Amino acid sequence: MKTYLRGSRFAAAIFASVLVLAACGGDDSDPSDDDGAAQEAPEPSDDPVHLTISHNAVRPDVVAVWIEDYVIPEFEAAMAAEGREVTVEHIEGGVDDYKTQLALDLSVGEGPDITSFDQFWTAEFAAGGLIEPLETVVGDIVNDWEGWDQIPEAVSGSLAVDGQQYGIPLGTDGRVLFFRTDLFEQAGLPTDWQPTSWDEILDAARTIQSELPDVIPMQLNAGVNMEEATTLQGFIPILLGAGGDLYADGSWQGDTPQLRETLEFYSTVFDEGLADSDMQLVTDGRDRSFEAFADGNLAIMIESDYLWRGVINPDGGFPIDGREDLVGWALIPAQQPGAGINGQDFVSASGGTGRVINPNTEHPLEAWELLSFMGSYEAQLDWVEREPRITAREDVNEVGIAEDPMQSFVAEEVLPLTWYRPGFEEYPQVSEAIQRMVENVIAGRSDVDSAAQEFHSNLEGIVGADNVSGE
Amino acid sequence: MTADDGRRRDDAAAPGHDVPTGSDGGQPSPAGGGSVQPVLADEGTTSVPEPEPRPKADATAEVAVINKPTAIGFVAPALGLIGVFMMFPAVWALYLGLTNYRVTGTAAREPEFVGTDNFTRALEDPLFTSSLWITLIFMAFSGVVGQMGLGFTLAWLFRRWRGWTRRTIEVLVIMSWIIPGSVVAFLWRAFLDGEGGTLNSLIPGDVTTEWLLRQPLLAIIVFNIWRGTAFAMLLFDAALNTLPPSHLETAKVSGASTWQTLRDIVFPAVRGHMLTTALLVSMWTFNLFTPFLLTGGGPNYQTEVLAIYVYRVGFGQGDFGFGSAVSAVMLVINLIIALVYFRVLRDRRKKS
C-alpha cells in the first residue's frame, strides 16, 4: 500500500484495502483437470528446455549453494551428454510468506517447475488442487525410480496423501534439548545433562538463574512470530510429554487436561522468568534466541537439529567455534518417566521437507528427471558433504552422518521415539491457533483456563465441533 | 532578504501555487484586496482567452456546446478503466467476503457461500474490536492531532522564512516523507532498539528500554507523525499563502495577539483546506500498513491496526474470505469518514 502515489491517495485510500485481497482472489479453476494426457509416458522434448527451480533461499544457504554449484552444472552436463539441450535456473528466494506466494502462483498456473516444499503443506495444497500426484503430472515412470527403495515409508509418506506420492522427500529432523556446557559448568551443573522429568528441566534453569543472573536460563518458543517453530519445538514436545496429542482416536484434541498441563508449564517458565518473554514477542525473536545461544547468553534451548547443522555450524548464521565442546544435547523428557505419549519416558517431534513438481509445468519429463537427479545417491551425497544431515535416503545416511555425533544421536535415539504431524489440510490453521494460544498465555493476555477454552472453540471453528474432543 | 520582500514575491507567485486538492481555495488578486471570489469569477467569464481559466466558469460554457452522447464518449474510457480496476475488485472483494474462500485446502477449490458469517465472526472476534480501536486511536493521534497539528505549526512558524534556512527545514521534513517505507522502518528500528539504539544512547544513564515492546502504540504514533507531517505541512503552507497579507497586517496593526489572529483570521480562511487535509490524512492513516514494518502488529496484537489484521487473517492464515469481509468493513468505515467530512465541508460552504 505504501507504494501508491500520494496524488492518488484519495482513491487509493478507499480502495487499497479491498484491492489487495481482490487482486489475489484469482482463479479457482483447476488448471490440471484438462491435462489428462499427462498419464501417458511423455517424450523427451526436441526443442531446448528451460526449467526453473526455487528453494526460498540465497547464498550462503547451503542448499542454494548446492543447487547452483552442483545440481545445475551436473544436470545440464548429463543432459548435454545425451544430446539434449536443457537449462536450469535457480530462482532465489528468502521471503517470509513463501507458502502464500507459492499457493497464489500455482493457483493461476504459474510458479517454478520444481519447488521446495514443507511436509505439512502437502495435505492442504493437495486438497486445494494446487499440486498433483507425481503419477498424474509425469506418468507411471515415476514408480520406476530407484530411490524409492532407499526411502523409509514413514519418510516418503510425509509427502503423500491417500497413498499418492506428491514429491520426493529430502530428509527429516528431530527436536532435542540443546545446552551450553560451558554455562552448565560455571553453574555447577553436569555437562552430560539428561533430565528425566519437567522438574529437572526447571531445576536446572533455576540453578542457572541464581548462579548466572546475566544469562537467560532457557528458551521455549512461544510467539506467533516464530510460526511453526512455536508449535513444533515448543508446544508439541511439551504436550506429548504430558501424554497428550493433537489428534487421537479419530478426533482433534481440544481443551484436555494434558493441554492445561502444557500451558501450566509455559506459565511456570515465563512467570518465574526462566525464559525471556520479550524474545517471543519481537518480530525477529528466533534469530535473537540463536544469537543469545551462540554468544553464551542463553543456556538451554528446545530446538530442531537444524540449530546444530544450519545455525551454529561454521557456515551458519550464528556460528559457535568449537560447538562440539561447548554445546551438549539431551532427549526431551516427559513430565514424569513414563508419562509421555504412548507411555514414553522421552518425546520428540519431527518434520521434513521435500520437493514437488508444478502440475502446470510445460516439461513434466525433464522436471522429473531433474527432481530424481537431485534425489539420487550421488547428488544427495554431495549435499550432505556440504552439510551433514539426515536425508531421506538410507544409503546416503550410512556415510553422510557417520562422523557427526549430533546427527547420529538424532538418527539413533530420537527418530525411534518421534512424532509426526497429522496429515490433514486443517493442520496449519490448528498450528496457528496453537501459536496464538501460547503467546496469549506468556504475554498475560489470557490465563491458562481462558486460553484453553478459547483454543477449544477456535479448534471447533476450524475442524467442526463434531471433530473435537475435550472439555 | 527582508520579510516584506519575500512576501511580495510570494503574492506574485500565488496563482501558480495551486493547492493540490482545493477547487475551493480562492486565490488572492495581485492587488490583495477585499472580496476575492466573486471578482475572480466575473473576470473568468468576461475575459475569454486567459491562459489560466477558472474551472467552474468554463464548465458551464462547455456543457452548452457538447451534446450528451459526445460527452459520454469522452468519459467512457476513464469510466471503463475505473470500472475494471476499481469497481470490479471492490465488488469482487465484497463477493469473496460472503464465501469461505481460502488460499489452500478444499475451500480453495470449492469455496462455499456462507452469507454474513464472516461479518458476524469479525464482530465477535475480540481481536477485531481491539484492532478497530487501535486503528482509531492511531488515526486520531498520529494523523489528525499529530501530523496536522505539527504540520500547521511548522507551516505557520516558517511562513515568513525564506532562503537557505527555509530550504533546509523543508528538505529535512520532506525527506522523512519521501524515503521508502522499508528503509525508514529499518532506521526507526535501529533508533528504538533496546540495546545500542540511538534513542537510548541519547537518554542519560544506562537505559535499555525496548521501546517497541514497552510503548508499542506510542512508538508507531510518533513514527507516523514524523513520517507524514511533511504532507500536512505542504498543504498548510499552500493554504497560508492564499491568505491576503493585508488581513494579517490589519490584525497586527490593531494589536491582535497571535492566538487572536489565528482564531479570527487564519483559521476561518483556511478551514476548507483543513477539512480536506483532515480527510486525506485520516483515510490515509486509517488504511496504513507501515506499522507492520516496525512491530509486525505486536507485541501480542498491541499495534495490530486493521490493515495488519487483514494481512494476518488473509495472508498469514490464508483466509481470503474472512479477510475480504474485514476489508469490506474497512471500506464502509472509510466511506463514513469521507461522508462526515463532506457534510462538514458542505455546511461550511452553505454558511459562507
What do these predicted regions represent?
Chain B
Residues 1-76, 163-167, 342-352:
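Transmembrane alpha-helical segments of polytopic membrane transport and secretion proteins
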Residues 67-352:
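A structural signal for multi-pass alpha-helical bundles of membrane permease subunits
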